[in-house]
């Protein structure tokens, strides 16, 4: 018997185009900036094959999330209908009371209101049981369909992913600031690039400025401490990414991506290919797999974007178009970069720093401004996202370890510990490593595989089984995944396990 789902008001709706844009912006993020580097390391042909294959499998598991969410709505509607039937039965049994007329009128009014909120009829039950009108987050679906062990494993997987997310954000901001502040000639040192993963050790001896003794590593750590001290305290407050901030961030993001692609194409046309990446390089698979999984990650936030879409029947089509365009965009961004530049930084924006460029006229000055905008672009976007992700992590830690229904009964000291638990581990990780490729590889391969592959498989499996027991097989789920055979579930599960094993062997051998 599933847990009772509380009713909630429906969210405001938006058009299919707005939903398309929101989902597009959700998927395309920091991971895209790491793709050129991993493409260069793994080889262009191998990278093409892997990213297309992972895009298809990621879309497959997204359809599992949609189906599971529709099943959660069906269970909610079923529970509400049972409650209405019990209410009607109780009203009929109370007809012999002294206030039978008043009770019947009040009960009838309540039933009318409940039926208005749940448009469920016997004649049209196949259409109304399965909906996407009410938002069910992954945590709610895990609580609904999983047992206690499954719920704990879900939260652990999500928490590890969010820790990785914060570590990537911190390292990306600190590295971007360091490479902008320090002498740019040192920024091109081959020991600090994707091809040489030992950059952390070399930055210990490389000076940030020729006339000073502070090393690039120490400058990175100073900037990391400053970033954490400035944005870390926001985790104690209820900070939200407003619509206007989201629109501004999206505008900056697309301006930056467009400029990067245009500059790379211009360099390819004007001076030819400077980069000569390999065709296949199996040693680049760990970073490639992790970055691709990380770049297609949207599953943990997708339900909140699906519920407000006005025409729910178009959800699958919107997502399929999103995935096709995003995959093509990733390939264009990475392929132009690996052939336009001789060497690729693991954060692609750092390849656009104005090395040895002098200001001589308006156009050279404009080019320098564009280069600095691209180099500083991750700092703005990730700084605005850092507090939101940290607050999400804090809330999930509290949900895992505390009884949120009795939250106010816990001591203030205990409640103040959770924001620190959200901030300190990512800081410690990035203090001792600045390798974005390693952070992305680990986060995408392990926690990302759990959230993007394994959790959707188990969610849709238990959702199908629960709905079959409650509603029977005669009620059709119009949001059912096109990959409805159980063989697809087995395939995705085996695929994810094999990938994690192979990546682990390559990563630690």
Swiss-Prot record:
InterPro entries: AA_transpt_TM (IPR013057)
Glycosites: 186, 202-203
Keyword Calcium: no
Keyword terms: Glycoprotein, Membrane, Transmembrane, Transmembrane helix
Topology relative to the membrane: Multi-pass membrane protein
Residue intervals annotated with topology Cytoplasmic: 1-19, 67-151, 240-248, 299-320, 383-411, 461-487
One Gene Ontology term, aspect cellular component: membrane
Subcellular location: Membrane
Highest taxon listed in the record's lineage: Eukaryota
Transmembrane domains' residue ranges: 20-40, 46-66, 152-172, 219-239, 249-269, 278-298, 321-341, 362-382, 412-432, 440-460, 488-508
Membrane topology, Extracellular segments: 41-45, 173-218, 270-277, 342-361, 433-439, 509
Similarity field: Belongs to the TMEM104 family.
PANTHER family: TRANSMEMBRANE PROTEIN 104, TRANSMEMBRANE PROTEIN 104-RELATED
Protein name: Transmembrane protein 104 homolog
Taxonomic path: Eukaryota, Metazoa, Ecdysozoa, Arthropoda, Hexapoda
């Amino acid at each position: 018997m599933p847990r009772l789902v509380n009713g909630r008001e429906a969210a405001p709706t938006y058009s299919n185009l707005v939903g398309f844009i929101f989902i597009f912006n959700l998927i395309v993020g920091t991971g895209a900036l790491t793709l050129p580097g991993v493409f260069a390391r793994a080889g262009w042909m191998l990278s093409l094959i892997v990213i297309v294959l992972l895009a298809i499998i990621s879309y497959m598991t997204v359809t599992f999330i949609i189906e599971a969410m529709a099943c959660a709505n069906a269970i909610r509607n079923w529970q509400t209908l049972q409650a209405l039937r019990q209410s009607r039965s109780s009203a009929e049994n109370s007809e012999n009371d002294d206030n039978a007329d008043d009770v019947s009128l009040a009960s009838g009014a309540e039933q009318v209101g409940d039926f208005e909120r749940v448009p469920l009829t016997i004649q049209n039950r196949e259409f109304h049981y399965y909906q996407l009108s009410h938002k069910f987050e992954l945590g709610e679906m895990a609580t609904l369909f999983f047992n206690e062990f499954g719920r704990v494993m879900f939260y652990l997987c999500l928490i590890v992913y969010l820790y990785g997310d914060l570590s990537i954000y911190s390292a990306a901001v600190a590295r971007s600031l360091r490479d902008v502040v320090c002498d740019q000639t040192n920024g091109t040192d081959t020991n600090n690039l994707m091809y040489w993963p030992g950059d952390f050790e070399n930055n210990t001896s490389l000076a940030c400025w020729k006339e000073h003794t502070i090393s690039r590593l120490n400058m990175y750590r100073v900037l990391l401490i400053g970033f954490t001290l400035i944005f870390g305290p926001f985790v104690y407050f209820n900070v939200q990414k407003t619509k206007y901030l989201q629109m501004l961030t999206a505008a900056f993001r697309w301006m930056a991506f467009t400029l990067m692609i245009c500059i790379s194409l211009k360099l390819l046309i004007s001076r030819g290919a400077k980069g000569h990446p390999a065709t296949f390089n199996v040693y680049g698979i760990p970073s490639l797999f992790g970055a691709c999984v990380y770049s297609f990650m949207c599953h943990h936030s997708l339900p909140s974007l699906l519920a407000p879409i006005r025409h729910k029947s178009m959800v699958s089509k919107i997502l399929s178009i999103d995935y096709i365009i995003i995959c093509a965009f990733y390939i264009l961004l990475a392929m132009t970069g690996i052939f336009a530049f001789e060497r690729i930084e693991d954060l692609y924006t750092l390849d656009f720093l104005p090395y040895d460029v002098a200001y001589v006229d308006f156009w050279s000055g404009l080019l320098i401004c564009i280069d600095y905008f691209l180099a500083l672009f991750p700092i703005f976007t990730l700084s605005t996202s850092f507090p939101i992700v940290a607050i999400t992590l804090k809330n999930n830690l509290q949900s895992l370890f505390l009884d949120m229904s009795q939250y106010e009964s816990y001591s203030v000291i205990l409640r103040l510990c959770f924001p620190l638990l959200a901030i300190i581990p990512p800081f410690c990780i990035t203090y001792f490593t600045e390798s974005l490729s390693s952070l992305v590889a680990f986060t995408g391969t392990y926690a990302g595989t759990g959230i993007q592959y394994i959790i959707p498989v188990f969610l849709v499996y238990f959702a199908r089984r629960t709905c079959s027991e409650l509603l029977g097989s005669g009620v059709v789920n119009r949001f059912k995944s096109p990959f409805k055979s159980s063989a697809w579930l087995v395939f995705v599960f085996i695929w994810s396990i094999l990938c994690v094993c192979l990546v682990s062997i390559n990563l630690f051998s």
